[in-house]
From Swiss-Prot:
Gene Ontology biological process terms from the UniProt entry: mitochondrial electron transport, ubiquinol to cytochrome c
Miscellaneous field: Heme 1 (or BL or b562) is low-potential and absorbs at about 562 nm, and heme 2 (or BH or b566) is high-potential and absorbs at about 566 nm.
Cofactor note: Binds 2 heme b groups non-covalently.
Sample GO molecular function, one term: ubiquinol-cytochrome-c reductase activity
A Pfam family of this chain: Cytochrome_B
PROSITE patterns: CYTB_CTER, CYTB_NTER
Main location: mitochondrion
Membrane topology: Multi-pass membrane protein
UniProt-annotated location(s): Mitochondrion inner membrane
Family: Belongs to the cytochrome b family.
Ranges that cross the membrane: 33-53, 77-98, 113-133, 178-198, 226-246, 288-308, 320-340, 347-367
Function: Component of the ubiquinol-cytochrome c reductase complex (complex III or cytochrome b-c1 complex) that is part of the mitochondrial respiratory chain. The b-c1 complex mediates electron transfer from ubiquinol to cytochrome c. Contributes to the generation of a proton gradient across the mitochondrial membrane that is then used for ATP synthesis.
Protein name: Cytochrome b
Amino acid sequence: MTNIRKTHPLLKIVNHSLIDLPAPSNISAWWNFGSLLGLCLMIQILTGLFLAMHYTSDTATAFSSVTHICRDVNYGWLIRYLHANGASTFFICLYMHVGRGIYYGSYTYLETWNIGIILLFAVMATAFMGYVLPWGQMSFWGATVITNLLSAIPYIGTTLVEWIWGGFSVDKATLTRFFAFHFILPFIIAALVMIHLLFLHETGSNNPSGIPSDSDKIPFHPYYTIKDVLGFLMVILLLMLLVLFSPDLLGDPDNYTPANPLNTPPHIKPEWYFLFAYAILRSIPNKLGGVLALVMSILILAIIPFLHMSKQRSMMFRPISQVLFWILVADLLTLTWIGGQPVEYPFITIGQVASILYFSIILILMPLASLIENKILKW
């Protein structure tokens, strides 16, 4: 008798995706981030669902409802801080996952890569709208500043912004619709994840060497299931340490002040995971130019596959490209730091240099390095 997991219409899909899936024998811990992102998404959906049971999306009561969750709901404080810091964990895993894709040339799987970029945009949109919901000072002013960027679009900009706001300023209508979108988007993300995996399983996983691994596959279960579970335990441990010892470490104290349209906070800034893009936005003195640079800072990922000049897929054996990659990482960390600083000398200049370097490395220096490496290897 054939095993039920190989014949049952539903279990068959699970079997081919998680159990009998042929996987490369040499994938490292950098390949754990996909499953970790799945874990983060599940944590966010579950904690978010329980928060939504007690939250009210009304300007008069939103702030109080969050306070009520933390003070009066059983383990409400735990659910709230798991959700807030779960978002940070999500983005750490996301950036590591994308970085892995760039380093090992996983972007050559075009469909998988492009769905991944759409996923990144969707997660960023969800996180932004979620940050508005507690209706603190930074929620309100963050929403005002970021939605206002759309007014830089020629001709239709102002109309578009007022349409998104549902009025002439960020108000009750805005909060209600942001809550609706924040609730629905994670389920759309979950559906996109399925498509992401569908495309990935068409080709199979890449591996650190970048060489086809068809001749050396091992079953996903038990080898990589146990490896994923170890990753889960480590991430849950780190998340719980953050939640239970310093839950407000990554938050902004201004968000503990209820939203007040008449009082602007001294430094309006987004959560840490958007600071690099915020720094790029601020480094350009022109509004439309800044918005375009902001969008391009993420959309540039879609261009990367077409700039791949190397005869090798992975950076594993390409020292010049490796150096540039780690300079890019350092540059992104610099931009993150600058995004959280006030707009004054020397931060403005550092931000501008770092922004130019970011685009230069990806668009010019990395393709050049690849060509030089090909030349050295006489290819």
